[in-house]
């Protein structure tokens, strides 16, 4: 019997990520996985349902998770989803266990194994599963763009026939894997 994977549409405000992209879905189906995805899960990142080949679409998240072996989400699932998951299922998600203690207790009580993506160590052996580094890199890039947008002057040095404009001076602070 093939492994049944359910992928849910994100429901939190301003969340524009999807837990599974078409390229990875293709690889998993070639390995024999049976993938079921909530309709519109990729809409926020401009991935239409038709981009997911050999994936069954369903608008109902509860029906999707009811008999799924593995459930994929980006943000922690809603309590109704956890309640509908079968005992012994696996959840792969950012769950923020330190903030979401009720969710963590509910997962434990329902005997659901959870791979908390925010807790995957940033080490060489776990590099293929390191979701935090890529997300931190995107956040840093976004912060630089946001900072440049809010500067009172222009960021790059400009030299024209009329004259030159000195560049703005900036200080970038952060701590991450690359900075250690």
Language model features with spans:
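Hydrophobic/small residue at the entry helix of a nucleotide-binding pocket
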Residues: 178
């Amino acid at each position: 019997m093939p492994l049944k994977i359910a992928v849910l549409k994100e429901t939190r405000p301003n969340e524009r990520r999807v837990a599974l992209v078409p390229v990875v879905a293709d690889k998993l189906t070639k390995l024999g996985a049976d993938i079921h995805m909530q309709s519109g899960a990729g809409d926020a990142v401009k991935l239409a349902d038709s981009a997911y080949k050999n994936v069954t679409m369903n608008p109902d998240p509860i029906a999707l998770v009811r008999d799924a072996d593995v459930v994929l989400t980006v943000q922690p699932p809603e309590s109704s989803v956890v309640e509908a998951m079968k005992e012994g299922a696996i959840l792969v998600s950012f769950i923020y266990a330190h903030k979401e203690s009720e969710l963590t207790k509910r997962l434990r009580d329902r005997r659901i194994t959870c791979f908390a993506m925010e807790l995957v160590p940033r080490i060489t052996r776990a590099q293929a599963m390191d979701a935090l580094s890529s997300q931190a890199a995107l956040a840093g890039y976004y912060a630089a763009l946001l900072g440049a947008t809010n500067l009172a002057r222009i960021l790059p040095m400009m030299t024209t026939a009329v004259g030159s404009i000195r560049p703005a001076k900036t200080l970038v602070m952060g701590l991450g894997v690359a900075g250690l």
